[in-house]
Amino acid sequence: MLLTRKADFSASHVCRNPSLSEEENRALYGANANPHGHGHNYVLEVTIEGDPDPVTGMVFDLRELKEIINAEVVDPMDHRFLNHEVPPFDHTVPTTENIAVEIWKRLDHRIALPNVHLKNVRLYETADLYVDYGGER
């Protein structure tokens, strides 16, 4: 059974690779390479997979899942300039893809139980742009 919990956070970032020239960054990332950055109101969907516990009837305690998402993602990333305030984005380009991978890394170890595991991280950068990440294959 799949269970999905939503959360949102606002953050700013700039997409630029320090090993590339200004011209290369602008060609690659366009306006997203503006050194002053820009922001998004991200929507995060965290999906876990498991069987309902025979005693509780729940796959996972929803309050605990919310607390984990807040502690690992929302609290450290909300209203932050990712490049300057949230490792590893001081040395990794904070694309939506890379942010989704980092969120996975932060959550995977916190959700791993004998019969429950993290299935997918979906991160919306805008209403019509999102990334799905299901861990390394």
Language-model segments: residues:
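Charge-rich, low-complexity N-terminal segments
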Residues: M1-R137
